[in-house]
């Protein structure tokens, strides 16, 4: 995280080679993650076209989602987005900047208009855990068209990381309980990246 801003981008050819090698090993699902993967949306769509036997997924802040991208996503049919959101407008903008929540909602509306599958990604910390797992928030995300959800606990990384944002032991226990309730009662496929490790016999990343 301390290296954000440095230009360490993989070329399209390298990305394509990684996927080709992965397929030889039986891997057909690929995730793109931060900074902001959609700064490479042209290359991602190109990869989707070239590897129709694979499915691609990206975490995004939604600011680069436009109608053209939505049309391309619908055409390739093997690319989905999870929008980073941390609860209601107040708690989302608290850590991600003023106006971020509204931009995410606008991107969700655009995706729904184009009848695309999408979800949300929530980083839970000391000041938003109860908000981001509340019925009010989850139901709102479902109504906006989300079909899946990723939950990540805040981990302080980098030179100026805030340790005061770490979720408490009680909040992590609450998340374990609530994620199972959400899966049982909501039309939403929800995953807690940390607490659900038991289902993958270890790290969910693979």
Language-model segment annotations:
Residues 1-13:
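Canonical Radical SAM [4Fe-4S] cluster-binding loop centered on the CxxxCxxC motif
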Residues 12-32, 40-153:
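Radical SAM/AdoMet-radical enzyme domain recognition
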